[in-house]
């Protein structure tokens, strides 16, 4: 169940990312991203002096992200995009379960960019909200509703992060 005080309205998804990074990480925190990836994550994190840990595909898999590689990293946060931007990969139920459980067990802040939900091919991508209440889900009206100029996004956050978000929003 999501309560209304867990939803923060932002200036597009970029505003949600900035608010989330400022609310959750300090200078020198380590945040992992799977490459290939939407460049704004890397750029915003670096501008805040947050260390970016890029997880690249296996040597023989140029464009397939292997989420199990996260277990080899010591990080404070993980950003996933599902479906992925730019390669369109959609994580399986087993992969999402692994990501969620790994982050929960290791106290890694999990941020799920779900802006491409609803416009994927094949089976519909699952929201990280289906796996529990320890993830931050970011979305906007830009893609699914074809409203990019409106700059209207949101973040759904775990209750324990609410005070951090309120200080900055």
Regions found by a protein language model. Name each.
Residues 59-123:
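Active-site phosphate-binding strand-loop segment of PLP-dependent enzymes
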Residues 14, 82-86, 143:
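Short glycine-rich anion-binding loops that position phosphate/pyrophosphate groups of nucleotides
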Residues 7, 31-32, 45, 78, ...:
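Generic structural signal for small/hydrophobic residues in well-ordered secondary structure
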Residues 16-17, 40, 117-119:
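Catalytic P-loop NTPase motifs of RecA-like helicase/translocase cores
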Residues 133-169:
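Conserved core segment of the aminotransferase class I/II
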Residues 22-82, 101:
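PLP-dependent aminotransferase-like
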Residues 1-30:
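Phosphate-binding glycine-rich loop
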Residues 29, 50, 105-109, 133:
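A short helix->loop->beta-strand "cap" motif at the edges of active sites that frequently abuts
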């Amino acid at each position: 169940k999501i309560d209304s005080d867990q939803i923060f309205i932002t200036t597009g998804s970029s505003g949600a990312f900035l608010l989330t990074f400022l609310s959750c990480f300090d200078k020198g925190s380590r945040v992992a991203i799977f490459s290939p990836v939407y460049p704004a994550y890397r750029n915003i994190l670096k501008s805040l002096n947050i260390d970016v840990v890029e997880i690249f595909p296996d040597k023989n898999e140029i464009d397939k992200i292997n989420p199990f590689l996260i277990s080899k990293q010591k990080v404070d946060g993980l950003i996933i995009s599902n479906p992925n931007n730019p390669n369109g990969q959609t994580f399986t139920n087993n992969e999402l379960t692994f990501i969620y459980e790994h982050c929960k067990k290791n106290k890694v802040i999990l941020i799920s960019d779900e802006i491409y939900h609803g416009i994927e091919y094949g089976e519909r991508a699952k929201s990280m909200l289906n796996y529990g209440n320890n993830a931050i889900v970011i979305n906007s009206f830009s893609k699914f509703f074809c409203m990019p100029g409106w700059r209207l996004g949101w973040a759904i956050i775990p209750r324990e992060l609410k005070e951090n978000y309120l200080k900055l929003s």
